[in-house]
Amino acid sequence: MAGKKEFSVFMHELVPEHRVISEEEKEELLRRYRIRLSQLPQIKASDPAVVELGAKPGDVIEIKRKSPTAGVYLYYRLVVED
């Protein structure tokens, strides 16, 4: 049997760009939108993109999505345990 192929979920054309934001960026995000961390949409720590990023519960992921009408927009999700 040949060696296992490496696969990155980020190489797929339908998967948008993801990144873990810093603590400073997280605080600014919450302040800008006047929300609490618990009010962000959630993403499970077992999500393939989260695993590949090495994010842990409590981190916030910024997702850069493309839109035919809005161009590019940012979406934020809180990493939670399964």
Swiss-Prot record:
Gene Ontology MF annotations: DNA binding; DNA-directed RNA polymerase activity
An example Gene Ontology CC term for this record: cytoplasm
Chief localisation class: cytoplasm
UniProtKB keywords: Cytoplasm, DNA-directed RNA polymerase, Nucleotidyltransferase, Transcription, Transferase
Name of this chain's protein: DNA-directed RNA polymerase subunit Rpo5
This protein's record includes keyword Isomerase: no
Matching InterPro entries: Arch_Rpo5/euc_Rpb5, RNA_pol_subH/Rpb5_C, RNA_pol_subH/Rpb5_CS, RPB5-like_sf
PROSITE patterns assigned: RNA_POL_H_23KD
Any one GO biological process: transcription elongation by RNA polymerase I
Enzyme class: transferase
Function of the molecule: DNA-dependent RNA polymerase (RNAP) catalyzes the transcription of DNA into RNA using the four ribonucleoside triphosphates as substrates.
Chemical reaction(s) catalysed: RNA(n) + a ribonucleoside 5'-triphosphate = RNA(n+1) + diphosphate
Alphabetical list of Pfam families matching this protein: RNA_pol_Rpb5_C (PF01191)
Organism whose genome encodes this protein: Thermococcus gammatolerans (strain DSM 15229 / JCM 11827 / EJ3)
